[in-house]
């Protein structure tokens, strides 16, 4: 079919009566894209040329004849050159998928025409099935789905693009959903074109662990999270639930303090982890149980350390799950009790515990004095 379409396009040009050497040789693209329509498309100015080129790219069309009978013959070349430059520079799909656009002037049906050829560096499927995100919120959702699937990349057309710190976005999502993001990948980011409110966003993820292994780890970690939900009694108070989840997490193993690239899996399935893994998993387990727990980043005795701040009965407290490595039990601590810990106080709630009741005001003695006694 591709070869037939190419021959039809060449035939349109040859029937004009010009010599064969006056026209571009039309060869089907090896990537499998469509070769186009032999019917010439009439263009009369720059805007129409630009629209025709963008339509070719959007449809993954390789060859198309443009009829330029209504244009000044002396302006055709300059106008088409400008339209090609603009298309490649500003159109998201062209910037993403086009390797080269070439053309040859001639005639079609005894009228001036241009045979345009486009060479692509993406497959027809990649072009025609490009996902779309209306804004950065939808883009973030697509990125999260890709992370959940341990995919190696995600690409989409973003209609309203805003510059974003994607490394931080991925780290935040991984911290909130450690049962899904087993390993935080390194990220390579590209936008097509490089600048603009509407562009194609491509993120490539690199993992040290194979996708098959990551999916297996996901399944095992999610089973542990399911067990944690069952461990919490529905009629318990929030204080009891915090304590139950603390015990569930810290008493699973005789833990060994080490850092792992598959933090949640190593901690929950092999008893190997650091303070960050403890705090992240505890916060996520609390969230699945309807409890509020933040992950705090700071230092403990001068070393990098992570712990949690929980909200219990309307009051905030510090809880350090990794203290179990030193034999610690569940304790709700106020700020003044965090000896050896340092954190950015402006970033987290103040942990003062319940307010002390105000002392009762002294009542004035209204009993009569001895002088007034009768």
Where are these regions (language model features)?
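Mature secreted bioactive peptide module from preproproteins
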Residues: 168, 172, 200-202, 224, ...
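N-terminal accessory/pre-domain segments preceding catalytic cores
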Residues: 19-234, 344-374
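Secondary-structure boundary elements
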Residues: 209-268
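Hydrophobic/aromatic-rich core segments of domains that either
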Residues: 277-342
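Sec-dependent signal peptide recognition
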Residues: 2-10
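C-terminal motif of bacterial Sec signal peptides marking the signal peptidase cleavage site
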Residues: 13-17
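Periplasmic OmpA-like peptidoglycan-binding domain that tethers envelope proteins to the cell wall
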Residues: 266-276
């Amino acid at each position: 079919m591709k070869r037939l379409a190419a021959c039809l396009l060449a035939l349109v040009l040859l029937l004009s009566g010009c010599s064969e050497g006056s026209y571009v040789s039309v060869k089907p693209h090896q990537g499998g894209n469509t070769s186009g329509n032999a019917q010439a498309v009439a263009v009369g100015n720059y805007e129409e040329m630009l629209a025709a080129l963008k339509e070719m790219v959007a449809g993954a069309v390789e060859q198309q004849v443009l009829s330029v009978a209504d244009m000044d013959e002396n302006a055709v070349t300059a106008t088409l050159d400008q339209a090609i430059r603009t298309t490649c520079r500003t159109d998201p799909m062209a910037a993403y998928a086009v390797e080269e656009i070439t053309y040859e002037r001639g005639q079609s049906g005894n009228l001036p025409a241009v045979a345009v050829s486009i060479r692509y560096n993406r497959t027809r499927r990649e072009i025609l099935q490009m996902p779309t995100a209306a804004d950065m919120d939808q883009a973030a959702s697509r990125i999260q789905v890709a992370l959940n699937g341990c995919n190696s990349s995600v690409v989409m057309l973003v209609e309203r693009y805003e510059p974003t710190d994607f490394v931080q976005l991925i780290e935040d999502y991984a911290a909130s959903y450690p049962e899904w993001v087993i390993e935080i990948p390194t990220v390579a980011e590209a936008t097509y074109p490089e600048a603009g409110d509407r562009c194609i966003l491509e993120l490539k993820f690199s993992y040290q662990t194979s996708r098959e292994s990551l999916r297996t780890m996901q399944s095992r970690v999610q089973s542990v999270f399911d067990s944690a939900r069952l461990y919490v009694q529905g009629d318990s108070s929030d204080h009891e639930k915090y304590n139950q989840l603390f015990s569930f997490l810290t008493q699973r193993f005789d833990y060994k303090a080490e850092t792992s690239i598959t933090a949640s899996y190593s901690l929950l399935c092999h008893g190997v982890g650091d303070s960050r893994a403890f705090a992240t998993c505890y916060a996520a387990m609390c969230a699945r149980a309807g409890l509020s727990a933040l992950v705090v980043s700071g230092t403990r005795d001068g070393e990098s350390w992570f712990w949690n701040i929980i909200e219990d009965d309307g009051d905030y407290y510090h809880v350090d799950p990794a203290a179990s490595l030193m034999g610690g039990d569940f304790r709700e601590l106020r700020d003044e009790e965090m000896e050896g810990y340092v954190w950015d106080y402006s970033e987290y709630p103040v942990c003062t515990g319940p307010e002390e009741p105000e002392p009762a005001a002294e009542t004035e003695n209204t009993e009569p004095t001895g002088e007034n006694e009768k």
